[in-house]
Curated annotation (Swiss-Prot):
Substrate binds at D110, G111, S112, S113, N196. Keywords: Calvin cycle, Carbohydrate metabolism, Cytoplasm, Hydrolase, Magnesium, Metal-binding. Its cofactor is Mg(2+). PANTHER family: FRUCTOSE-1,6-BISPHOSPHATASE-RELATED, SEDOHEPTULOSE-1,7-BISPHOSPHATASE, CHLOROPLASTIC. Its EC number is 3.1.3.11. GO terms for molecular function: fructose 1,6-bisphosphate 1-phosphatase activity; magnesium ion binding. This is Fructose-1,6-bisphosphatase class 1 1. GO terms for biological process: fructose 1,6-bisphosphate metabolic process; fructose 6-phosphate metabolic process; fructose metabolic process; gluconeogenesis; reductive pentose-phosphate cycle; sucrose biosynthetic process. Gene3D superfamilies: 3.40.190.80, Fructose-1,6-Bisphosphatase, subunit A, domain 1. Pathway: Carbohydrate biosynthesis; Calvin cycle. Transmembrane segments: none annotated. Homotetramer. It is found in: Cytoplasm.
Amino acid sequence: MTAPEGTLESFLEGDCSVSEPLAITVTALAFVAETLAGVISSGPLNGRLGEEVGANSDGDRQKKLDVVADELFAGALAPTPVRWYASEERPTAEMLNPEGTLALAIDPLDGSSNIDVNISIGTIFSVFEAKESGVESFLRPGREQIAAGYVVYGPQTVFILATRTTLAQFVLHRGHFFLVSDSLRIPDRTTEFAINASNYRHWSRPIRAFVDDCIAGDEGPWGENFNMRWVASLVAETHRILTRGGIFLYPADARRGYGQGRLRLVYECAPIAFIVERAGGKATDGIDRILDLTPSELHQRTPLVFGTAEKVSQVCAYHDLPESEVSPLFGTRGLFRA
């Protein structure tokens, strides 16, 4: 049966860079995304989706919809070419199809704290070629991914797919994801930054200095006024930056449990970095490229700074300075002012 023209299915059929196993896997992910979009759009009519039902192996509180989403994805992927399945909601990688050739890591429901307040939430996924064991399949640099993507469940349900050669955006309409763009690119200039400013006192001096220089506006080193954004949903932040530019910062800080950042490298940061680089942006841990980092454990955390390449490079420059040279007054001394 031929897929309807302009749909995700027809896109996968026509893209020679997408192997058959990957196409089958992405189609299964899209099927679950459509199902979840329906569940989410009905909100409390489907029960208390934001109710806490326990904690995952890493200590994060699980909401009912976290568990539902994880079970839906694992079930739909079981008959596909996915050999290894790694989820935020499960302690270890699990074998789905012994004959499979792919390994898929996933955050089934990103931003679940926003469920009850009707703010955009999403799904993030990463695909590797499978190795003999689950550990080998996922504890490798993100640059070895063959595909990554995310879904935003918001006013529109959007599916973003990145492969090694393509980056495409699809929107759900009447049971199908339709292609709306295959030329996404993060704008080269930005006047927006996203960070949770309530944690300012816990940040390192380079992060505080960068934010201070943004807040200084047209009196600071950038010579223009900035707006701050914060949604507490990584997919929502990513999609805004992919659409209109900006920089996102979730740094390490001095609080207990935040010394290595809070976001997970394997199934959050690496796939987002893969997408961002495909769109012409940059993604680092504040210093080093995310896609060059090799995780030592499945649920490893890392700081994350991504977005418009110029601004991400400037954050790295703040970290390169001697500690004595970094202060909230740094900008007025003119490293970036002509």
